């Protein structure tokens, strides 16, 4: 194979994937952008060919939408933080295990992904409801019942359960690339286990923590099933708000505008977080 032909080969092989991505991602995104600028009439619906900025102005000028944006992002940030705190030690323990226990533990970590998110949401609603298992346990001690369903607590707990595997796997992958002799050398030179973990291990698994946190935050901010089933009608997040605009209010242009603003805000937060962590990672490694 000549050199120019060999240089073109990777592009030729990736062309089907690029076309598929363009058809399934870029085309719908472009149509959503166009829809978000269409004039909406309550009687006839979106007016193709008539464009306006009113939908974006309605979102950025109404405190109601700011409150929902804020709720979405603080819940997503809290879920990401909890997943880091729980998932990083879990990945470390998984990495230190030997066969066959490692395979069993890995199956336990991945098992939630084999069950539908809707089924898991219904399971949590049965646990957290007024007559659920948790309130039943409190009642056995003469306390409660406590309102847990349709609260931020229910949404956070269920999202952590759903998103935790997306944190464990990237961190575990980074730990597998870690040379254990480096940490052992630090211990032999007098460093405490905590110091070796903080100065040697954590900086090297930072890429895994970064990728895991970006996945968890992005999926949490755009999650629909968990907030919809465990948050109820009053505890709205951005995905449930978009759903209401599309299917209840039938205001598709406003729903499209909210979806694009959510996408833009998500990208800003994730790129900012990525930049901050990369700087700390480079600084830690010198």
Region annotations inferred by a language model:
Residues 189-190, 203:
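Glycine/proline-centered hinge or cleavage motifs at structural transition points of membrane proteins
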Residues 178-182, 281-282:
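Short glycine/proline-centered loop/turn elements that form peptide/ligand docking sites
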Residues 186:
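The alpha-helix within a helix-turn-helix
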Residues 44-49, 126, 224-250, 286:
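Glycine-rich helix-loop "coupling/hinge" segments at transmembrane-helix boundaries
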Residues 276-286:
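Short cytosolic juxtamembrane segments of multi-pass membrane proteins
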Residues 144, 191-193:
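Short coil/turn motifs that cap or connect alpha-helices
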Residues 1-7:
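Short, Lys/Arg-rich, polar N-terminal cytosolic tail immediately upstream
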Residues 9-42, 57-176, 200-224, 229-231, ...:
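Membrane-water interface segments at the C-terminal ends of transmembrane alpha-helices
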């Amino acid at each position: 194979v000549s050199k120019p032909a060999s240089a073109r080969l990777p592009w030729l092989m990736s062309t089907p994937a690029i076309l598929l991505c363009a058809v399934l991602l870029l085309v719908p995104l472009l149509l959503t952008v166009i829809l978000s600028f269409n004039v909406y009439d309550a009687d006839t619906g979106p007016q193709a060919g008539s464009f306006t900025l009113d939908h974006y102005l309605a979102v950025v000028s109404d405190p109601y939408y700011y409150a929902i944006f804020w709720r979405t992002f603080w819940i997503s940030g809290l879920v990401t933080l909890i997943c880091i705190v729980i998932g990083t030690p879990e990945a470390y323990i998984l990495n230190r295990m030997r066969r066959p226990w490692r395979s069993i533990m890995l199956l336990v970590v991945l098992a939630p992904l084999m069950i539908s998110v809707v089924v898991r949401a219904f399971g949590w609603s049965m646990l957290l409801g007024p007559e659920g298992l948790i309130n039943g346990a409190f009642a056995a001690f003469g306390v409660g019942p406590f309102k847990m369903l349709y609260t931020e607590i229910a949404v956070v707990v269920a999202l952590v359960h759903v998103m935790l595997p997306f944190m464990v796997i990237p961190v575990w992958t980074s730990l597998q690339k870690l040379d254990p002799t480096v940490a052992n050398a630090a211990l032999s030179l007098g460093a405490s286990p905590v110091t070796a973990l903080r100065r040697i291990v954590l900086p090297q698994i930072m890429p895994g923590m970064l990728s895991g946190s970006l996945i968890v935050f992005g999926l949490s901010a755009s999650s629909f099933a968990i907030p919809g089933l465990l948050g109820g009608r009053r505890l709205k997040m951005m995905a449930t708000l978009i759903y209401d605009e599309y299917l209840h209010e039938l205001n598709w242009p406003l729903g499209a505008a909210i979806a694009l603003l959510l996408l833009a805000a998500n990208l800003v937060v994730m790129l900012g977080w990525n930049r901050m962590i990369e700087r700390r990672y480079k600084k830690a490694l010198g």
